[in-house]
From Swiss-Prot:
Belongs to the UPF0165 family. Possibly the antitoxin component of a type II toxin-antitoxin (TA) system. It comes from Pyrococcus abyssi (strain GE5 / Orsay). This is Putative antitoxin PYRAB08720. Keywords: Toxin-antitoxin system. InterPro entries: AF2212-like (IPR008203), AF2212-like_dom_sf (IPR024069). Pfam families: AF2212-like. SUPFAM superfamilies: AF2212/PG0164-like. Transmembrane segments: none annotated. It comes from the Archaea.
Amino acid sequence: MGEIIEVIYENGILKPLKKLPFKEGEKLIVEVKSTNKEKLLEELKGSIKLGKKVTITRILELEDEVWSSI
């Protein structure tokens, strides 16, 4: 069974943003992914071919345009 759970990292601890559906003492495997867009785009840089140079700043601008039009 897999579930994606949003957390916030504070004072060295991952704190879930909602109540967890697990039993006390249950062992889990955790995969951590950052929601930092700039960091994610930097990691993906070069893996997508667009035929022209596009900066990370422009990609973030386009994302804002798309979401603001919905």
